[in-house]
Structures are given as C-alpha cells and as structure tokens.
C-alpha cells in the first residue's frame, strides 16, 4: 500500500446519498449512523484544509418514477418517497461553500453538473464515500474513472444493504479504479 498524500487544492470530497431516505434503512458492515458520523468528521477535516466538499443526493421522483425499471430477474422493490426522503442528513453540517448535487440515477455524473463543479475548480482527485457502496458509490466511481479522476475510496465511510455486495466493491472493483484507504489514513494525510 503506497503512502497517501492529498493536495487540498486539487482534491474534493464527494459523499454519496447520505440522506434521510437512504440512511434510515439497515446497512452493513457499517451501520448508517456510524457512516454518517465518520463522513461528518471527514467533511470537517476537508473543510479545515479549504477543500471542496460535494454532497450528492438522489431524487428518484414520486414513488421512484425517475429510476430505471427494466425487466429484471431481481427487480427493485417499490419505493415510497416522502418529502423528507431526499433531505441530506443534518449531521453533515452543510456549509455555504459546499456543493450539493441532485441526481436521479445511481451515477452522480449522469445528467448533473458534478463534472462542471470539479473541472472548474481544477479537481483531479476525489475522496469517495457514501451509501450504498455497490450502487451509488460504485456507479459514481466507475464514471469518475472513465473521466480520468484519481480516486481514494474510504470503506469505513461506506455501507450497503448486504455485506457481500459491499465487500465485492471494496475488494474487487475499487482497487482497479483507485486506492482504498481507511479513514484514519485519510485523516492523517489531511492533518
């Protein structure tokens, strides 16, 4: 594992779907409240270094109407979206300089202005966390990789609905797209 150095001028923190509707469910291997607390700690450290913090939320539309619903062997269950469902969790302590991106698909780059925000600020590296590891985080990671971004994945700031789905992303997918590091290593690099 190589040493981690972070250039605050060219690095952004991107947190995926830490919102009421997503974090209300059971998550593994990290419980959602733990992911939120760690994400808040990481966001505060990034802000202290003057880094861009991007808070991504998903709005699937009324009852999930904006999510794709293909014929599938394991279709997604119906989704009930309340007005609070899309609200970012308050523990993230959103600041005026934070960028909020609203997406309608798992990938935070698809049909959003995320790439514009990153590009105009000269961002080359993304620190990535959120829920769900294997859906929103992985879809965004693949898209970031295709766009040439360096990435640092922080698994203890991630969770999924099933542990094997989380572990597959962390052990098999993310190491091919960037570097996987625990939160304490990232915080040390930010100190």
Region locations from a protein language model:
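Glycine-centered short loops/turns at secondary-structure junctions
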Residues: 48-51, 122, 148
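Internal catalytic-core helix/loop-beta-alpha segment
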Residues: 82-85, 89-130
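A short glycine-rich beta-strand->turn/loop micro-motif centered on a GG-aromatic cluster
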Residues: 127-130, 150-163
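Short Gly/Thr/Asp-enriched flexible loops that form oxyanion-binding sites at enzyme active sites
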Residues: 137-147
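Active-site-proximal loop->helix
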Residues: 162-175
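A charged, well-structured terminal subsegment
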Residues: 177-191
